[in-house]
């Protein structure tokens, strides 16, 4: 997710398969990683035989057909993001989009309008590290919603317990289940 890079400056090195991995130096304290990284705390969650580690799962989709068919997995998170902006619950949405310099890559972005959210929505079939620059993206006088993968949200939620200032800025955490049921909503 890149949170260790944003908070601690940990270098992210590409490993086999093209995935970024924290390059933890020999002798470096693992306290931060153990307290925030999903790799270390998944074991504490209840595990369902089919779904894995869950607390609650809901199914839904956007009532706006334009969003439902353009966005990923029925557009529920895009619709919620638009609602949060339209109703001034947040100033911006932190999420991912394709890299305009290389559409095969994913980058983090901040959307402040419904139009931006909709233009940047859709499935990303590539690696993303949406928390890599989270501290640099957030302005303390603004309110945000963050949209990411379940592991990104888990890491960010645990970090927010340590950072009161960031907790006041990122007030909604939203995640999705990897296009699991998109054909049901079409």
Task: Give residue spans per PLM region.
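Iron-sulfur cluster-binding cysteine motifs and their immediate structural context
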Residues: 3-23, 30-50
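Short, flexible, glycine/charge-rich loop motifs used to bind or transfer phosphoryl groups or to couple energy/partner
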Residues: 24-27, 134
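Iron-sulfur-associated redox domains of electron-transfer enzymes in respiratory
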Residues: 38-186
């Amino acid at each position: 997710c890149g949170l260790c890079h944003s908070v601690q400056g940990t270098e992210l090195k590409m490993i086999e398969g093209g995935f970024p991995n924290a390059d933890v130096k020999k002798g470096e304290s693992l306290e931060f990683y153990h307290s925030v990284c999903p790799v270390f705390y998944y074991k504490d969650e209840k595990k369902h035989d089919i779904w894995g580690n869950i607390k609650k799962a809901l199914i839904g989709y956007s009532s706006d057909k334009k969003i439902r068919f353009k966005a990923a997995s029925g557009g529920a998170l895009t619709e919620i993001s638009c609602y949060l902006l339209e109703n001034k619950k947040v100033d911006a949405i932190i999420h991912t989009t394709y890299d305009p310099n290389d559409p095969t890559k994913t980058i983090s972005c901040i959307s402040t309008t419904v139009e931006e959210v909709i233009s940047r929505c859709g499935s990303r079939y590539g690696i993303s590290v949406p928390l890599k620059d989270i501290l640099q993206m957030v302005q303390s006088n603004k309110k945000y919603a963050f949209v990411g993968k379940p592991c990104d949200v888990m890491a960010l939620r645990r970090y927010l317990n340590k950072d009161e200032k960031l907790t006041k800025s990122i007030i909604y955490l939203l995640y999705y289940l990897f296009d699991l049921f998109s054909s049901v909503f079409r």
